[in-house]
Amino acid sequence: MPSPPLGVVQRRLTFTHQRVYPGLTNEPRHWVRSNPQATAIAFLMRDDNGVAQLWLISPQGGEPRQLTHHATGVQSAFNWHPSGKWLGLVLENRIACCDAQSGRIDFLTARHDNPPSADAVVFSPDGRHVAWMEEVKGFRQLWVTETGR
């Protein structure tokens, strides 16, 4: 069986078996993401009410910190803003930015009849715009808006 290269150390960061909803959530589908500074890893996990929320953990270990506390839950995969100060996601059928320190949500769009695609919310390299996909009349379309950041 192949093993990691010599000197590579693997560590488990989350121990969630005692939680009401153990483990990271698989819905919405997402990928864990490190901030640009490599000081925080973001992921989705259900809170004690079973609602998918955004959480952060240090790559050095420690307790996960719940970042969002929203009644309806995160609806999509997420991405870090290039500054590492915000995360982009879908919430309440709207594109939103979440402050990575406080968890404050700023909505960037009005509520859409069709929810934006749960695949991803993607920032431009300068962080001034965000793009996403949304279905219109049976076809996925590409959308973009300014972030104000």
Locate predicted features.
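Sequence signature of WD/YWTD-type beta-propeller architectures
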Residues: 1-149
